[in-house]
Regions:
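Extracellular/oxidizing-compartment recognition motifs
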Residues: 1-435, 442-443, 457-462, 475, ...
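Extended, well-ordered alpha-helical scaffold segments
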Residues: 413, 457-468, 528-545
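Charged catalytic carboxylate motif
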Residues: 416, 446, 460, 513, ...
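Short alpha-helical scaffolding segments that buttress acidic/His motifs in well-ordered protein cores
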Residues: 420, 447-448, 464-468
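Amphipathic, well-ordered alpha-helical segments in soluble domains
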Residues: 443, 464, 510-517, 541
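Well-ordered alpha-helical scaffold segments within catalytic/enzyme domains
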Residues: 446-457, 513-530
Length: 546
C-alpha cells in the first residue's frame, strides 16, 4: 500500500518453557532494527524464542517469530582443558619460511544413545578444520580467524546432532599455523606458547533428558599428517604419501599416536564468534589455458580474486605438482611474481602450493592458506583446464547494494570495486589479499561507508572494532594495523614519522578510523549500540590526538 509506515512495535522474548523474559510493551516508533535489549541477564547455553509484532498507519499488524541460542557466557562454563602437541614452533627471530607441519588431533568416545541435541564449542591456537566421525562439521575456513589473541580469541559453536550416533564416535581437529603462528604475528605473541593447541567441549542431551559432556583433555592424541607446512603468505606443502586414512573416524587405531599435554592457557580471552564465517563464496572455471613464451603452463581465471585453486590429480607416485599464483603477467605474457621483494614485505610471500602425488586419483585444495591471484603457473604435469577450479574466499555477508548505468565503463568500475571488497574482507578488512593481508586502519577509514552500502558489514566491522579496542594502548594510541601484526609496529613508527607524531606508531589518517568507522555504521544503519560499545575507545583516541 502506498505511503505505508510503521507506527509501533512490540518485542517479546520467552524461554523454551514459555516464561516471558522480556516484553517491550507497545512502543510508538518507526524503528525496526538495532532495538536494544533491556531485559534480564540471559543464561548460558539456552534457547530463547522472540516474537515481534508491528503495526502500520493503516491499522494493519504483522507478527514474526524466531529463536536464538546463547553460548558459553562465563569462564566457569568451560570444563574442557587446553591441550597441545608435544612439538613447538621455532622461537627466536621470526621470519618467513619457518613453518611447522600441521597437527592432527583426535579423541574417541562412546555414547549410550543417539543424542537429540549436541553442541560442540571449539577453538585452537592456529587455524583448524573440525571433523565428526570423518565428516566436516561445516564449511567454514580458517577458524578461529584473526584477532588480538592474547585478549580476544573466538570460539565457534556447532550443531552436530545429526553427525553423532550411538556407540563409538570421534572428534578430529586438523590444525595449521594460521595467523596465530604466522611470522607476521610472532613478535607480538611473547606471552603465548609457540605450539598448536586445541580446546573443545561437546555437550549432549539424550532422548531420556540425561546429559553427557565430552571434553578436550589428556586423552586427546595427536600426530603429524600430510600438510608439511602451511603459511598464509608462503602457501601450503601437501604430501599425499603421508596421508593417514580415516584418522578422524571412530574406531581408528591411534595407539601409535602421541598423547597431548595439558596447557594452562585459561579462558579469560574466549569470546563466541561475532558474525559470519569465512567460506567459499564463488567458484570460477579456467577462462584460458596457455603456454607462455617461456614454455610454461599458465591458467587464467579471468578475474583477480582472493582464494585458492582446487585441482583434480591423477599422476604417478612422487610427482610434485606446483601451483604458483600471481595477479598479472609480464609484457611478453610470462608468469610474473608481482609482489616478491616489494619493500621487503614481499620477501617469502611465495603464494605457492605444492602437492606430492601418491599415485591415486584425488581432489586437492589447500587447507590453511589463501592467495591473491588471477593467474596460476602449473609445473610438474601437463594440465587440463577442466581439472582446475578457482575458489573465491571471503567472509560471508548479505548483499545490499547494486549499481547499474548506461555506461559499461562505470558498470565495470563498480564490478571491480565489488571484487576488491570481496577479496579484502576476509576475517579482517585488509589492504590487499596477496602481499600484506593486513588490517590497515586508514583503508577502512576511507572505505567503510561504501562497504556498508554494498554489503551488511555490521557484524564484520563490530568484531574488527573490538580488535581495535584490544590493540589500543594505555595512552589511547590506535596502531596503524589492527590486529597489530609483528611486521607492522616498526613500519607504523616509520610512517608516523612521515605523517604523524614522530615514533608513535600512529597517525590521524589511520587512527581516526576509531571514530569514523563506528560513526559510519551509525549513519548508514542507525545502529546506536556500536557507538555505545566503541565510545570509550573513540574518546581515548580523541584525548590522545588533542
Amino acid at each position: 500500500i502506498p505511503n505505508t509506515m510503521q507506527e509501533s512495535y512490540q518485542l517479546t522474548i520467552k524461554d523454551t518453557a514459555g516464561n516471558c523474559i522480556y516484553d517491550s510493551g507497545v512502543v510508538e516508533s518507526s524503528s525496526n532494527a538495532y532495538i536494544p535489549y533491556k531485559g534480564a541477564k540471559l543464561q548460558s547455553k539456552m534457547r530463547y524464542l522472540w516474537t515481534v509484532r508491528v503495526s502500520d498507519n493503516h491499522g494493519n499488524t504483522a507478527t514474526a517469530t524466531s529463536s536464538f541460542e546463547t553460548g558459553l557466557l562465563s569462564e566457569s562454563d568451560w570444563s574442557a582443558k587446553w591441550v597441545k602437541a608435544h612439538k613447538k614452533g621455532k622461537k627466536g627471530k621470526p621470519g618467513f619460511g619457518k613453518q611447522q607441519p600441521a597437527t592432527l588431533f583426535r579423541k574417541q568416545f562412546a555414547l549410550k544413545d543417539k543424542p537429540v541435541k549436541a553442541r560442540l564449542y571449539a577453538t585452537c591456537h592456529g587455524t583448524y578444520e573440525l571433523y565428526l566421525n570423518g565428516s566436516r562439521a561445516d564449511s567454514r575456513l580458517l577458524a578461529p580467524e584473526h584477532t588480538v589473541y592474547e585478549k580476544y580469541l573466538c570460539y565457534q559453536t556447532y550443531d552436530v546432532t545429526e553427525q553423532l550416533t550411538e556407540g563409538s564416535n570421534a572428534i578430529g581437529m586438523h590444525v595449521g599455523d594460521g595467523w596465530y603462528l604466522c611470522p607476521q604475528s610472532l613478535p607480538n605473541m611473547k606471552k603465548m606458547d609457540y605450539a598448536h593447541a586445541v580446546l573443545f567441549q561437546l555437550e549432549i542431551t539424550y532422548p531420556d533428558g540425561s546429559m553427557d559432556m565430552i571434553i578436550s583433555d589428556e586423552d586427546v592424541k595427536c600426530s603429524n599428517g600430510p600438510v608439511l607446512s602451511a603459511d598464509l603468505y608462503a602457501g601450503e606443502y601437501y604430501d599425499a604419501n603421508k596421508q593417514i586414512k580415516n584418522w578422524n573416524c571412530a574406531d581408528f587405531m591411534d595407539s601409535g599416536w602421541t598423547s597431548c599435554m595439558e596447557a594452562n592457557y585459561g579462558y579469560e580471552n574466549l569470546v563466541s564468534q561475532i558474525g559470519e564465517p569465512v567460506i567459499i563464496v564463488k567458484e570460477l572455471p579456467v577462462s584460458r589455458l596457455t603456454k607462455s613464451p617461456k614454455g610454461e603452463w599458465i591458467l587464467d581465471f579471468g578475474q583477480n580474486i582472493a582464494g585458492f585453486v582446487r585441482m583434480k590429480v591423477n599422476a604417478p607416485k612422487g610427482t610434485q605438482i606446483t601451483l604458483e599464483h600471481c595477479e598479472i603477467l609480464d609484457k611478453q605474457g610470462n608468469f610474473f611474481n608481482n609482489i616478491q621483494g616489494a619493500g621487503g614485505v614481499g620477501k617469502g610471500v611465495d603464494q605457492k602450493d605444492v602437492y606430492v602425488c601418491d599415485g591415486t586419483s584425488a581432489t586437492y585444495e589447500p587447507h590453511f592458506t589463501y592467495h591473491g591471484f588471477r593467474y596460476v603457473r602449473v609445473t610438474g604435469i601437463e594440465p587440463k583446464a577442466e581439472d582446475f577450479t578457482a575458489c573465491v574466499v571471503s567472509t560471508e555477508k548479505e548483499n545490499l547494494g547494486t549499481f547499474k548505468t548506461s555506461d559499461e565503463r562505470l558498470n565495470r568500475l563498480y564490478e571491480n570495486i565489488r571484487w576488491s571488497q570481496c577479496a579484502n574482507m576476509l576475517s579482517v578488512p585488509t589492504d590487499c589479499p596477496q602481499r600484506e593481508k593486513a588490517g590497515w586502519t586508514g583503508d577502512m577509514l576511507v572505505y567503510s561507508r561504501t562497504a556498508l552500502l554494498n554489503e551488511d558489514c555490521t557484524a564484520f566491522f563490530t568484531r574488527w572494532l573490538y580488535n581495535m579496542e584490544c590493540d589500543q594502548d594505555e595512552y589511547g594510541i590506535i596502531p596503524m594495523v589492527v590486529p597489530q601484526d609483528g611486521n607492522y609496529p616498526s613500519m607504523g613508527k616509520l610512517m608516523s614519522m612521515m605523517y604523524g607524531v614522530k615514533g608513535s606508531g600512529t597517525s590521524s589518517g589511520w587512527g581516526d578510523a576509531a571514530v569514523v568507522v563506528p560513526y559510519s555504521m551509525y549513519e548508514i544503519t542507525g545502529n546506536t549500540d556500536i557507538l555505545r560499545q566503541q565510545y570509550y575507545c573513540m574518546r581515548r583516541w580523541c584525548d590522545y590526538i588533542i
